[in-house]
């Protein structure tokens, strides 16, 4: 009974890593720096309401930021987002 639970936990963890790890790698430069423009939108942990902008891979899009946490793909204006993330 204990072995079956352990194997299920290992399988679940393996699947979770297979899904999460490629997304993290795709946001990383060859020198190890993270390209914030490739990170997904993240509204953070709080329940406040701030309209912010994130780069979705093509353009800058509005989203609601909760005020705490999240990631660095978050800009106060569309102009700031485009300046940082849009490719010329």
UniProtKB/Swiss-Prot annotation:
Residues 28-33 form a propeptide. Expressed by the venom gland. The record marks 39 as: May bind Kv1. SUPFAM superfamilies: BPTI-like. Keywords: Disulfide bond, Protease inhibitor, Secreted, Serine protease inhibitor, Signal. The keyword Signal applies. Pfam families: Kunitz_BPTI (PF00014). GO terms for cellular component: extracellular space. The keyword Disulfide bond applies. It is found in: Secreted. One of its GO terms (molecular function) is serine-type endopeptidase inhibitor activity. The record marks 47-48 as: Reactive bond for chymotrypsin. Disulfide bonds join 37-85, 60-81. GO terms for biological process: envenomation resulting in negative regulation of voltage-gated potassium channel activity in another organism. Serine protease inhibitor that inhibits trypsin at a molar ratio of 1:1. Belongs to the venom Kunitz-type family. 03 (sub-Kunitz) subfamily. This is Kunitz-type U15-theraphotoxin-Hhn1a.
């Amino acid at each position: 009974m204990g072995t079956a639970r352990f194997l299920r936990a290992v399988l679940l963890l393996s699947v979770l890593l297979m899904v999460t790890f490629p997304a993290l790698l795709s946001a990383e430069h060859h020198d190890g720096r993270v390209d914030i423009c490739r990170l997904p939108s993240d509204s953070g942990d709080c329940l406040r309401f701030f309209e912010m902008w994130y780069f979705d891979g093509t353009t800058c899009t509005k989203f609601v930021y909760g005020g705490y946490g999240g990631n660095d793909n978050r800009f106060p204006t569309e102009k700031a987002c485009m300046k940082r993330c849009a490719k010329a």
